[in-house]
Every structure is written in structure tokens, then in C-alpha cells.
Amino acid sequence: MVLLALAGICALLGAHFLLGALRLAAGLLAGAGAGAFLLALLGGRLRRRMRVLLAAGLALVVAAALTVPAVLATRPDRLERAAIATLAPLREGEAVHSAPDEQGPVLVRRADGTAQLVSAESGVEELEAAPEDVLALSADGTRLVQVTDELTRVSERGGGSAPVEVPGTPLALAGDVLVVRACEAGTCRLSGVDLGAPDQPLWTVSDAEQTRGPDPVGTELPAGDGAATGLLDAVAATGVLPEVPLRFDPDQGWLQVDPATGFAVGRVLAPADAECRIAATPAPSDPQALQQRGPQVLTVCAGEDGELTATAHEDGQVLWESASSPAGDWTVRLDAGRVLATGTEEGTTTEGEILASERQSAWEAPGGQGVDQAEAFTARLGIDGTRMVVTNASGQMVAYDTATGAHLWTLPLDSPDAEVRGGLGASTVVVLDEIRREHPLDPRGLRRLRVVDAADGTVTAELVTAEELTELRPLSGGRALISTEQQAVLLGG
């Protein structure tokens, strides 16, 4: 009886102080008490050796039943058990890219210039690439594009057909048509090449020797930086070759090119002498639309005093144009048919954010008046052209439309005081939040890792882990590449 009483005391103290040692001691003491009780109950009915064996067996069974299941139930998850693919850990300076296609492969570019293609179907595929090569995925994720010394090599995902090599630097890949720019003896030309019949170009037009490239989508850039962007700078930064070909003419400015004919589409997108940023982005998400609109070309031009004017085009025609923003020192991000500017307004030192979108001509704070009535934010996990993801004082992770402030979805956190770490990218949220210890055998330092499809808040992967995570890289399709010091794993999808 004394042993059983001690077991009860240990169980109570362990539950109160959340001490695992006391909880285990309670199970062992309960087993010992049960064995002693059986020994006393049997008395002299059996031989001594038999009585001892039965009592010891009961003690072992009771102790195991009270400890082993409890220990197993609180063991943290292992990343590799939920992994779609496992590869070497990510290091500083290594890039991870995914195409907007939801389940396309993931391109990993290592610091030494080597590269890997990762997918659920083929696992980890090592790519032959020199450090100076530019590697990118097509916008639909079905092809890999490799540029070496002005030679473009296009490989179909899965190796269904032989790679196609085309002389020149790629500007875009629209379906099966690759638009390239090649120069020889001071003469430059643009060509459209059907990858199904690459021997003869579909069309060829002359191009100026002086040119520049568009800007990377979703990347924060100085608004008034007059430095010319290289033809492949955006492709190298995003790891994706766009499907809309954009051409810079030093006499006219920026033009959109029809990949089927090589002719300019619509009006001049931005004048040659203006300080403008330009990129082709997906259209803003519209849940009410029966069919998603095609890509849009965004421009944002800076005036002499730093005021910004943003314009959205579709097929060379203006969809909307913003009014001038307040003058100031701004960086801009072109993403999902909207322009997000961060910086300081002239005459102030406080940094803020303003947004230009299809909603109205005036620049406004992200979320507009739609988030004015929302509960106070405690942290922001990320923002892009479509949504911003925040945490609030009620212990929730909430997504709002970046332009309208409309509530999109909500997920719970473990507690309002939980420390939260994570990020938003490629329409995916990766969040790591602390878990409160509620049971004595819960390990210390547990955190819950969730990969969330930012489009609708669907959790595509969820683990409770005690591992030290060094990198959280969100990817398209509700996936993420998570790295520790020992390995990196692809989760979600």
C-alpha cells in the first residue's frame, strides 16, 4: 500500500510540476506496488518461487503499461518520415526555386555552382552545370532551361525527348515556342523557335545591340535605380523563365513581343528614357472568376522627386494606371498584378508601405480600410501581391487580401504568447511555433512545423519536432524545403 501511495503522490507532483522523472517513477512504483499486493494476496497458497515470479511479472506488466505508451505518445516526429525527398542540407548562399505550377520540380542551386532537381516522382537528380551557367524552370514546370555561353539547352521534365539546343540567350518560353536573342558581328536578332522543330526559326526580327532585361518578380528593388538589368539577371534570381517575352528598344522603350510572330503587341509599355521597373507577373487572384486571367506586365516608374506611377498591361493594353504616389525614397516589388512599395515619404523618417492595385488609382496602405477593424497584429510572417499573413493577440495566424483587406483564412497557434517563426513565398506559408508542455513526459523545446497552402489555408504538412531547423524555404503548391544541419527534406504538396 505504501508503494501505491507513493506512486499516486509522484503522479500528482509530476502532473503539477510537469516533471517527467516523477511521472516515470509513478509508473514504476505502481508496478512494484501491484507486485507486492499480489505477493501478499497469494500468501502461502503457492510455492515461494512461483509467488515471486507471478508478482514480478505483474509488476513488470503494470510498470510497462503505465510508462511505455506514455513515452511513445510524446515522442517528436522525425522530418525524414514525412519527407517527399531527402537531400544534403542547405547552406548560406544556396538558392531554391520552384515554378508557379503547383507540383513541378524544385531547382536547388548550391553555393559551389552545382545544381539538383528535386521532385516526388524522381527524387533528387544531380544536374551537370558549371558555376557560370544559368539554370531555370519553365513557367509551367515541365522543362529545364540551361544557358551556357549564349547557348540555350532545353530539357523536357522526365526525359521524354532529347534536349534541344538553340543558339542565343532566352527571353521567354511560351508553350513550345522559345524566344531567343543572338548577336553576331555586331548584328542582333530575336527569333522564335518551335522546340518540336528547332532547325528552322518560326520568325526572326532585328534587334538593337544595346538592350537590357526585365526585373525579377517578387523581389524588392530600388525604384529609381538607373542601372540596367542584364538579360538573364531576373531569370537567375527567380529560377523561372517567363512566358511573356519583353524587349527593350533604346529608341522606343519596353515592348511586349508576340511569341508566335515576333511583332510588338499593343503600345509601348514604358519609355526608354524613364526610370522604370518592369516584370511579367501572374494576374491577381479572383475567387469569383470562372477562368484565371493570363499574365500581366507591370511597370512602375519613378519621377524626379521619387514619386511612383504604376501601370498594369495585358496583351500590350493598359488595364489600370495608378495616380502618383507621395514623393520619397522607395523600394518596389512587382508581384501578382500589384506593386508594393516600401520606404520613407519625403519629409519623414518613418518607414512605411504603400500599394498600387486594380482596386483604385490612389496608392494605399496594404489591406486598406479592410484591416482597420481587425484584431491587433503581433507579427507578420510575410506579404506578397496577393495576401499578407499575420499573427494576432488571440493566438491566430490570419491571411488578408493585400489590396482589399478581405479575410481569407485563419489557423490557430498553440497560444497567444507562442514564439512564431516562418515566412511566406510562392503562395505557401511555412510557420514554426512553440508548443506548451501539457504533460510531464512532453520533451522540452518542442515546436510545431506547418506547411500551409496560402491560397486557402490548407495545411499540407504538419509535424511536431525537437530538431533545430536552420532553413525554412516555402515553395509553390503548398510545399517547403526544410533544412537542419544534417539534411534537407521536401515536405507538403
Map each language-model feature to its residues:
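Short loop/turn segments that connect beta-strands within the blades of beta-propeller domains
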Residues: 102, 111-112, 139-140, 147-150, ...
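Residue position within the beta-strands of beta-propeller blades
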Residues: 108, 145-146, 180-181, 244-247, ...
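Loop/turn-rich, solvent-exposed surfaces of beta-rich toroidal or solenoidal domains
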Residues: 374-454
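Structural motif
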Residues: 112-117, 149-155, 185-193, 250-256, ...
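Repeated scaffold domains used in trafficking and secretory/extracellular systems
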Residues: 89-103, 130-142, 165-177, 207-243, ...
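Short loop/turn segments that connect beta-strands within beta-propeller blades
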Residues: 119-122, 155-159, 194-198, 259-261, ...
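A structural motif specific to WD40 beta-propellers
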Residues: 126, 161-163, 200-203, 263-266, ...
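N-terminal "mature head" segments of proteins
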Residues: 2-171, 485-493
